[in-house]
Amino acid sequence: MNTPIIDFSHPLPAETTTPAADRLIDGDPRQTVANYFADPSQQFFAGRWSSSPGKWRIRYSESEFCCLMTGRVVLQNLAGDRWEFGPGAGFVVPAGFEGTWEVLEDCTKFYAIFEART
């Protein structure tokens, strides 16, 4: 079997989105997402995501590895613990995380997401 490597340097059409109105806290973030890979089970995904500044509520049912390429972001959990990341930072948001995601300056990240079927 000859399975190709997925190369993120090749441009893909991106989908433009915004956070749901009931989750938006501040700003008018515009987001683009280009999903480069989905496994046959549809439980694992990888791609590129970008956003303009804003802040919104998040509730993760999936686990996500992020590698921030540009910009600055802040994640804060419901207990008030805060994590700030800049270019080159890698981090995991585990399934079950609840809090906020804030983009301080235009950012781009690569992501890998696993969402177990229930």
Across the structure, where does each feature detected by a protein language model lie?
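Short, conserved beta-strand element in jelly-roll/cupin
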Residues: 60-75
